[in-house]
Amino acid sequence: MAGERAQNLQDTFLNHVRKNKIPLTIFLVNGVKLQGVVTWFDNFCVLLRRDGHSQLVYKHAISTIMPGHPVQLFEQGEEGAEKG
């Protein structure tokens, strides 16, 4: 169940930043920093667009994703906002 929740959170986050065209900074496991907007994603990769160019990034290479501004995915009190 924890794996399903993590996948659902990942999909929810990526879909939100894609729909709202929120700029992201993505750090890869090798330290490379990428910036752009998510235009598409699936279970294995993310398509990142910047300055008219697209980059296909494999999720296993991603370390951290930082949105350009705060993202509110859940309303307070919703299941996804539970305290840990």
Curated annotation (Swiss-Prot):
Which Pfam family, any one of them, does this sequence belong to? Answer: Hfq
InterPro entries (alphabetical): Hfq, LSM_dom_sf, Sm
In alphabetical order, the GO MF annotations are: RNA binding
Q: Which PROSITE patterns match?
A: SM
Q: Which parts of the sequence belong to the Sm domain? A: 11-71
Please provide the record's keywords in A-Z order.
RNA-binding, Stress response
- Tell me yes or no: is Transmembrane helix among this UniProt entry's keywords: no
| Protein family according to the UniProt entry | Belongs to the Hfq family.
Instruction: Outline what the protein does.
Output: RNA chaperone that binds small regulatory RNA (sRNAs) and mRNAs to facilitate mRNA translational regulation in response to envelope stress, environmental stress and changes in metabolite concentrations. Also binds with high specificity to tRNAs.
The record describes its quaternary structure and partners as: Homohexamer.
Protein known as: RNA-binding protein Hfq
**Which species is listed as the source?**
Methylobacterium nodulans (strain LMG 21967 / CNCM I-2342 / ORS 2060)
Instruction: List the gene name.
Output: hfq
